[in-house]
């Protein structure tokens, strides 16, 4: 499945006018041909995609736009129908109107868009009422060919109603002849116990191959590229270990605060929101051993093995912060987290965290994995940074700095290596520079699909490689639950940091203490001026 996605999306054309890029006609045919040859992807079958929570923001901003792009580019089975379900009294026209700002439709695509929405329908009902789901099933059965159709249920819902919705899907809405797949959005629980309760509940209703726990970060281009970078290049294998890597830094930075969502965020915090899922998944791809194949089970088994080697996070290796307003800032930058009217007064919830983890196995023993994430920081950035050890036998009198390999996930996907080179001219002194692969420069005519496009297409094709397995989830919560419970019990006051800054200075001190060396001599500048 990985090869299929690579080929089908890398034949598209990149638009420079700000519109969502479209796949070329030849690309559509090539992609469709490869998809239709996949054993799980039956072009002639009828498929029904049901959006539970069709009136919500996630459906409006992500799910409907993604389905439209896949439909527009000819990447879905020919007979695919879309059914929205929510409590609100809505029409398909109302859904279309609310989604339009996010669909990125060009003038030439209006007929295709009308064809897409002609395949849409909407049913209003109660999430806890079996009668509503019986009506939903009757509506699905009224669609052409639906008696044999495959059904995909996307739960774009708050986790508080997962139990009742999944029970009603199981009892009233399952396809008797086709396959059934359920897509579940994070958060997958609040801690280890609640996650186990959710997993037990889901497994009592569905088999593991029917459950798709979606972490959209696993659909991002550079996150998926980590496996190819590691296991498709001979040069990295011998140095990807404790003998050569001094530390690994995984960074997730957002330049905005909670901005009215503080009440929701305050229930979870930055560790649950980003670190326990997105960042830990990236750590797995960096640290795991080579799987036997790219088969979903083989890949997920290796991720579980590396998670089992990580001991729970220790408070002594943690820095927590909370942003405050910048008096000299503009707009929202003047406001701190506690200025958000939806945030409880005096909240000690962290909006920034640095946590150091260690993988206790032969490859990584002693190497710190530094996870750093936060809101209201100085830039938008997500990256994986491997800093290598010093060159032994230095002959350049401490003028050489550590090599680094950086995989930039967002923005402007890139891979670059910081290295030493002779300074040009008559000098014989080392100078820090980079080897650079910036995607939008190297792949000018390539469309990089949205993460949800890849993942929803994976569900149609039956590939679970980029979805979270129940045993992965269990290990992830095992690592962070003791720390989260300690924070909730002791309520340590987070260190204040200014909106638009790099975060608390104490985080830099922690990174330095465990072995990361920030030289302060060099900043990578994108030479392509994207």
UniProtKB/Swiss-Prot annotation:
The catalytic residues are 278
Catalysed reactions listed for this entry? D-glucose 6-phosphate + NADP(+) = 6-phospho-D-glucono-1,5-lactone + NADPH + H(+)
GO biological process per UniProt: glucose 6-phosphate metabolic process; glucose metabolic process; NADP metabolic process; pentose-phosphate shunt, oxidative branch
* Gene3D superfamilies named among the record's database cross-references: Dihydrodipicolinate Reductase, domain 2, NAD(P)-binding Rossmann-like Domain
Q: What is its EC number?
A: 1.1.1.49
Q: Which GO terms describe its molecular function?
A: glucose-6-phosphate dehydrogenase activity; NADP binding
Q: Which gene encodes it?
A: g6pd
GO terms under cellular component = cytosol
Identify the pathway. Answer: Carbohydrate degradation; pentose phosphate pathway; D-ribulose 5-phosphate from D-glucose 6-phosphate (oxidative stage): step 1/3
User: What is the recorded name of this protein?
Assistant: Glucose-6-phosphate 1-dehydrogenase
Main site of residence?
cytoplasm
Which family does the record claim for this protein? Answer: Belongs to the glucose-6-phosphate dehydrogenase family.
The role this protein plays is:
Cytosolic glucose-6-phosphate dehydrogenase that catalyzes the first and rate-limiting step of the oxidative branch within the pentose phosphate pathway/shunt, an alternative route to glycolysis for the dissimilation of carbohydrates and a major source of reducing power and metabolic intermediates for fatty acid and nucleic acid biosynthetic processes.
Tell me which residues bind D-glucose 6-phosphate: 186, 216-220, 254, 273, 375, 380, 410
What residues bind NADP(+) 2, as annotated? Answer: 372, 381, 385, 408, 416-418, 436-438, 502, 518, 524
Question: What class does this enzyme belong to in the EC scheme?
Answer: oxidoreductase
